[in-house]
Amino acid sequence: MITSELSVLQDSTNESAVMHTDMTAVSADLSTELVEDLEVKGKRKRGRPGRPPSAIKKPRKTPGDRSRAEPGSRGRGRANGHPQQNGEGDPVTLFEVVKMGKSAMQAVVDDWIESYKQDRDIALLDLINFFIQCSGCKGTVRIEMFRNMQNAEIIRKMTEEFDEDSGDYPLTMPGPHWKKFRCNFCEFISVLIRQCQYSIIYDEYMMDTVISLLTGLSDSQVRAFRHTSTLAAMKLMTALVNVALNLSIHQDNTQRQYETERNKIINKRANERLELLLQKRKELQENQDEIENMMNSIFKGIFVHRYRDAIAEIRAICIEEIGVWMKMYSDAFLNDSYLKYVGWTLHDRQGEVRLKCLKALQSLYTNRELFPKLELFTNRFKDRIVSMTLDKEYDVAVEAIRLVTLILHGSEEALSNEDCENVYHLVYSAHRPVAVAAGEFLHKKLFSRHDPQAEEALAKRRGRSSPNGNLVKMLVLFFLESELHEHAAYLVDSLWESSQELLKDWECMTELLVEEPMQGEEVMSERQESALVELMVCTIRQAAEAHPPVGRGTGKRVLTAKERKTQLDDKTKLTEHFIVALPVLLSKYSADAEKVANLLQIPQYFDLELYSTGRMEKHLDSLLKQIRFVVEKHIESDVLEACSKTYSILCSEEYTIQNRVEIAHSQLIDELADRFSHAVEELLQEAEEADEDEIYNVMASLKRLTCFHNAHDLTKWDFFGNCYRLLRAGIEHEGMMEQIVVQALQCSHYSILWQLVKITEGNPSKEEMLALRKTVKSFLAVCQQCLSSMTTLVKEQAFMLLCDLLMIFSHQLTTGGRENLLLLVFNPDVGLQSELLSFVMDHVFIDQDDENQSMEGDEEDEANKIEALHKRRNLLASFCKLIIYDIVDMNAAADIFKHYMKYYNDYGDIIKETLSKTRQMDKIQCAKTLILSLQQLFNELVQEQGPNLDRTSAHVSGIKELARRFALTFGLDQIKTREAVATLHKDGIEFAFKYQNPKGPEYPPLNLAFLEVLSEFSSKLLRQDKKTVHSYLEKFLTDLMMERREDVWLPLISYRNSLVTGGDEDRLSVNSGGSNSKGSSVRSKKGRPPLHKKRVIEEESIDNSWVTRNDTIQTPGALTTPQLTSTVLRENPRQIPEQIPEQESEPSSEPDFLHSPQMQMSWLGQQKLEDLNRKDRTSMSYMKVRSGVRHAVRGLMEDDAEPIFEDVMMSSRGQLEDMNEEFEDTMVIDLPPSRNRRERAELRPDFFDSAAIIEDDSGFGMPMF
């Protein structure tokens, strides 16, 4: 038998141990006799329903059973009827047996039952300890505790034995081993009740003890006890429900036997059998009553309290099991008294609990026989279930839709039209499982054939090959009424799994489009035909590609062999059908641009080999003929691009039909080229006197050629010459031919790109490259001219082409071993850069009022605004791309950056990314650009309001706010950005003192107010750099300036204070010392030099650490070209000469301030050397005072061990919105929960050690930039 550890149960003394062993043996003998006696009485009283009397036998003894009588056989535990040994020879407990799961569960339970028969107290003690250990408790219930203590006292004692260091317990531990343990745990309880259902559960001891214990544990405040006991109780209840169901079945069978026997005639009636049947029915009823009492105890004592437990897992267990009870024993449990708990829990705040509710209800609604019992529940909670189709948890929404589908399947009257409409629109959901579930609902509601045979007969009478005609029309009507015509692909994808037969019925769709309606059929409108064509093309795409449309799913998944075969079969089927049908469809709808554009998408999904293998070349000729007619009829871009793409697909080299298609294509281009050439000559001859027909002929021919030139190499026709002539004429006669100029620009652009492709792929001669260079140069000049003349449409087109060509023909062209193409590299001159920037300022950063006025009265006002914004964003992005790749000077970005706040909603993401990339290129130049943008805003404000600015005005506050946002972009690592920030302060100081006040030296310089803006960056300076910048500031100050205290001098006072104060508040302790709390705590304990030594380090190195690390901290080089892109950086032309000649200049433009990274890196050093060489006693005494203050503050920090909390993100301003302004590539640092000031003081000097800096940089989880 399985016992608990008797060594734990026994007393510590030898005498008491002997006595306890004797008493245990006696107790075991007595309890065995008592149990056997009770079982005999129970059998005589109730019998064993469902089993013949001969089945009442004791379990057969095993060899291990005999070992129980041997002395010393009691150990830590027993399993399978004999002591189990682990690897070290120690027996294992019941918990360990179940956890290992190596033994058959029924054998484990049978052994426990036998031990119960021998000593029920010991066996129950094993079971109690099993539940305790399954809860993760290390304690053990002793036999004296079990006999002498109440359950509440035992649970309180076990609570004290919990391991408080870990919150995990078996049911919550991760991994497959513990997942299997949960299954074994549930199986053990189920098998235990099943094996005890004929005897032990009726002894009024075992079940009472277990239920009482589980009830107490389920009410514990310890989550592990509550969770484990609730799971055990619910599984126990489920097993009892199964027993009750069996008893009910036996009762019914016994009653039928009794009625049959009683209805016999008296001569054949067996009175003894009647008496036995009556006795059996009575015993069954008594057993049923006992089981019901047990179930009521569990339900009222545990379920009613735990279904609303604070822990979602516990609530989910309760709901899951009550669903099992209602399905298993619907006569007893499927009523409103139990359903209400599921209905109430539909409103649970946790998705997993709501999901269990829906799963439970699905199992009930699947059985249509149960619908009458669910009618009241459906009426009461239907609205809630329908609303859950919009649940924020997608898994819940999917199951809610499936439940609604089951309700519809069981009773169509249960759902109103409004309920159905709430589900219909979900077929357009971006989440595919939701959409597919809604598609299944839609299929059952609208597209299921109620009487297939009758519909097939009707179709034959009407001469149709498919009975799906009405369903296809219904699908079209649904699509049109949903008013989401751009989402046909989503609708098809949603219905694909449930309505494939309908969606693949391309013969039916073609019949509806081509053939005339039969008598009694309703004629399809033009709008319905367009919708049907769109849906048909979407079904073809879905069948050929076998993956969801863009926006649904995470990407293309690998198809299974079966799916791949289905895909190939579908592709063959659609190709065979549409090779014949497509020319007919194009012929009928050749005048309808929308239908033709959709129909021409079909050939890309063909298996083109079938043209030759199936000998269908005549159908190919028909298709090419129809495409040519379409090209001649239409000038819409969508139609022409579809024709061009179709030719490109059919011309593929891997198919034998290539030559036939290329001949047709060349003939078409020859004809279009001749028309274009003649039309251009006529137009240029007439010039300003050209009529509309001549202009239209040129525009139509050019538009067709442009669309074809996009996908085909047409350079042998040399369209660039005529296009260039049109462009020159358009510039001379401004406004005459706007559309022609736009198309000519685009066609010329394509021609240049195709010429470049030829040169890069071959071995070009110098003459070929010179010719292309000449072509590009002339085209760039024309585009530049278009920027200053012509209409807005032409300007925008010219600007985009200029940006693209400057990017393509930049230094990136020579990378990858293509140095021979250096002749083709173009660098924009200052004039072109200026014009591009002016265009951005005039056409991108425009006032909203102007835009609103220009669109006032438009019916599609909102759509036009969105389209206009999208166009402006593209213009800005194109120009910013030139800045990022160093094609346009970085200073041009100042005009972009200054609009960051004003246009944050429209362009904030683009400007932020540009700033991030420019900082990666050159930190120092980026900082100079930022301060330049602020200077520009300041100058604009001075020009508007004069030099006497109102410091409290909204305009000044706006500039300060922009400066604060810029400061946040430097991130938290002040070591990496120190030179850039110092350079920014230098430029700002020079700007503030650039112009002296003409009224005299007693008046502030004209730009002095700018220092208030500059003070926003002071928090980004290191402590020693603040002193350096302060010293540089003092160079510009006179004694008179330092004494002034009037309001006009407040910006200077404020800026000086920001440099002088706050030295002990900088964030060195959180910059580079570790990016997380764990790393910080390690650094604070390991490798830390003695405190007195660290003081010396700080005093000696705090003033010259910037000198010793000049070779360690370097400005990043040019921006590395990102992978998977065709753009490459050209070398920075502004390289640093080894020696800079001396030159005379004003103080604000000294040689050491030239734009040179190396010289900029040395600026702090030069300033510090000047400070060290100064012999001004006042300054030296001031520094001594500062040093003394630091010593005093450090002494206070060492003596004060009070924990502090610091939020590094809030240290500059303390405003929560600052968090959102950090760039995505800015390091986020997590501080430890607390650190006393002593630790922070001890940590600081590490950051002035070059070795520590290297260590810290390598320790970051991600780079700063």
UniProtKB/Swiss-Prot annotation:
UniProt keyword annotation of Hydrolase present: no
Locations listed in the record: Nucleus; Chromosome; Chromosome, Centromere
GO cellular component, one term: cohesin complex
Stretches for region Disordered: 1-21, 37-91, 1063-1097, 1111-1130
Organism superkingdom: Eukaryota
Coiled coil: none
Composition skew (Basic and acidic residues), residue ranges: 62-73
Pfam families, alphabetized: HEAT_SCC3-SA (PF24571), SCD (PF21581), STAG (PF08514)
Domain SCD: 303-388
Family matches, as InterPro entries: ARM-type_fold (IPR016024), Cohesin_Scc3/SA (IPR039662), HEAT_SCC3-SA (IPR056396), SCD (IPR020839), STAG (IPR013721)
Reported modifications of this chain: Phosphorylated by PLK1. The large dissociation of cohesin from chromosome arms during prophase is partly due to its phosphorylation.
GO molecular function: chromatin binding; protein heterodimerization activity
Main localisation: nucleus
Covalent S-S links between cysteines: none
Family recorded in the similarity comment: Belongs to the SCC3 family.
Function of the molecule: Component of cohesin complex, a complex required for the cohesion of sister chromatids after DNA replication. The cohesin complex apparently forms a large proteinaceous ring within which sister chromatids can be trapped. At anaphase, the complex is cleaved and dissociates from chromatin, allowing sister chromatids to segregate. The cohesin complex may also play a role in spindle pole assembly during mitosis.
Xref: PANTHER family: COHESIN SUBUNIT SA-1, STROMAL ANTIGEN
Name of the protein: Cohesin subunit SA-1
Organism ancestry: Eukaryota, Metazoa, Chordata, Craniata, Vertebrata
